[in-house]
Amino acid sequence: MEVDQIPLADVVFVIEGSAINGAYINELKTNYILPTLEHFTTGSIDEREYLIAERFATLYGIVVYRTAANLLEPVCSTYGPFLQPQKVMETIERLPLVGGGMESCAHMAEGFAAAHGCFDDISERRQLLDQTSVQRHCILICNSPPYQMPTTESWKYPGKSCEQLAALFNERKINLSIIAPRKMPVLFKLFMKADGDQPITSKNYAKNIRHLVLLKGYSLKERAPSPNSMAAQMAAPNAAQATVQQQQQQQQNQAGQQQQGQGMPMDTTPAQQQQQQQQQQQQQQQQGNPQQQVMNMNTMQQQQPGPNPPAGLLNPQQQQQLLQQQQQNQFVSNQMQNQNFQQNVGPGQNRWMYPNQPGQARPPFMQGAGNVGGVGQGGGMQQNPNSALISRINAPPPNQTVTSLQQQQQQQAQQQQQQQQQAQQQQQQRMQMLSQQQMLNHQQLQQQQQLAQQQQQQQQGQQQQQVNPNAGNNMMPASNAGNMSNPQQQQQQVGQQSNPQQQGNPQQQQQGNSQQEQASLREKIWTGVLEWSEKPKSDQQKIPHTLQCTVCTNIKDGEPEIKAENWPPKLLMQLMPKHLVGNIGGQFLKDSKMVVFRPTPGEALDSLAKMMTSGYAGCVHFSSIPNSPACDLKVLILLYTPDRNAFLGFIPNNQAMFVERLRKVIQQKQHGNMQQQQQQQQMMQQQGKSPMELQQQQQQQQQQQQMQQDNSQQQHYNQFQLNMQMGGGGPGGGPGPGPGGMPMQQNQMQMNMMQQQRMPLGVGVGVGVGPGGVPNPNLQQQLQQVAPNVAAMQQQQAQQQQQRMVRPMMSNNNPGLRQLLQHQTTPGNQFRPQMGGQNPNQMGAGGPMVGNRNFDDGNYEFM
């Protein structure tokens, strides 16, 4: 899938930052947030390539709102915008979804206001890129209802309630989706407000029956409806019948005991016992209105034909019949409300009224009446009217109502099936029509493309033959192979599209139409050969590859964005590690133009895709052709995206800076490789040497360092003597027969002794220290005697320096001083004492030496 075929979208997640929502965030993230990101990125977020410009990417934002318990923190926090979905997931995982202070509500209105502000900022960025047709989605993830108070912290949307901000989403054409761990009526109301008071669809996207998932503008994987408890009963009918029979027997025993306690006659028939048992069971299961029962009893008495029996016998029977009718009405209403119930329960089954099932309740009534009639006249005269009345009251009404309702439901189901079949037939007809149109359009496009390719190839072949006949002969087989592969592709595509059963759903067809429309917005600007060499792992020769391909670019203002009139017919590409391209700097790839390479299928394409998926990128060089205008481009970076199977070329706008930076990165890489090789060689040499040789090598290095230190100390000592001669002489410039000549010679000798004593102390080896490291006592006594003379000498030098400052012309007569001043820059650094063990070459007249440092450039934004 190509880049421009991805629908652009702006997605803002509004998340409740409380502990009650954080307890379910992992489940919501796995089931809904991650599939949402995969939907907008059209693939797995782990395999996606992120070297893509902002104008071709989906922008994400995150808004976190809190409760009233967070008094010292702002109500809302925003993160983003992000170009990479991985950063969105990392940010959501790091959100502090804790606290909340056991509040039952949260500042949802403030979160909606902040989301509106985020969409305003993103729309400004889209307008700079001339992108107006962008989908906008706001996804709410919460577990608490909103406070009934308007916004106070939003300066752009002040005083707005949560419902007003939800309605504003509909006005601004922003799709609001809601994901919550539990179902709340307030969320349904907000979703309807944001949808323009439209009814909520019956699609189920929830993984758990308790979750609330309301989506608008996009869809996830639909889930099956929640399983009904009736399925378990259908799976084990024998166990259910056994339990029902046991309950009936227990209820019969209880009814017989109650009859004995109330003083009822003991010679009741089994039919009467079952009637009383049914009456008690129905009274326990139903809580109806007594007034309605009395009214229904009166109506039933009016409808009964024949003489009225005694009141003591009719009241329980009529009450039983009325209770059965009420239960049947409730059963019918439950069937109308719950669609899954009717699917799981068959037409001949009854879930709640077990006594009315055929073969259980009614045959004992009729059999009991016949048996009692043959016992005696008294018993028969008393029981036959009752049994006939019971059969006339109980049997007809339930059967008529249930059968009529079942027939109506069957008719409705048949009508729905017919409507579904008609809709499916219409969809199939539309799909066939669309497939035929697509086939015709595709064939026409392919024919046009073939003609254009043939013409361009002929022209290029003629040009190449004029320039280089051998190159033309080498290119002809590749072009012929490309032309031969096109009819095979056409036959495969026509064969795939001609079979309607192999076609996908209408969404795939719509995507195909949109792909064709977007592909028509691109124009082919170049057709030629791409050449590169593959170096195997072993020390073999490089394997050259050539690939026939075309380059397409976007159309802007009716013209192609990039012109390839001066491009050479053959482009040379060099494979390089992808991390080197990242080290160049992301600003070059962001400030670039993009083209799409469409290569011809073959072995060369497979090898190139295999190399690029293993971590390589292509650096395409534009070479100049003699007797033709020069090409403005120098370098093009070619990248491969496996999830879309597309080769994308990025052309930096600043070619000179990009080439210079690329050269520096390659030099640094080569320098680092050379250093690694040298280190490896040294390690190998050291591993081959014996321990005695290693010790001798270390001793030699130490002696060299000590010699360097001694030389530097001798240089400093000579320089110190020159300075002393400059300051201690008379007008003649030296320690001659002037007034101060003899004392200065003595002072010079004393300073020499001081210097000889001090300098070995800093180095660790010298005159003042014996072989065992014990200081010489004679030298210490001499130093104690010289110390007062040194103080007097320093005072005399200060007085003479003041005299020279009063008479500056005197220094011109001293050529040694003039020469020293010319070479001397910063005396403070020259007379700085050397610390023990320090390398004198590290500090010089100009501070620390920086000439030997390697190139280190940290100003670039590394990816």
Swiss-Prot record:
It is found in: Nucleus. Residues 370-381 have a biased composition (Gly residues). One of its GO terms (biological process) is positive regulation of transcription by RNA polymerase II. One of its GO terms (molecular function) is transcription coregulator activity. Keywords: Activator, Nucleus, Transcription, Transcription regulation. Component of the Mediator complex. This is Mediator of RNA polymerase II transcription subunit 25. The lineage of its organism: Eukaryota, Metazoa, Ecdysozoa, Arthropoda, Hexapoda.
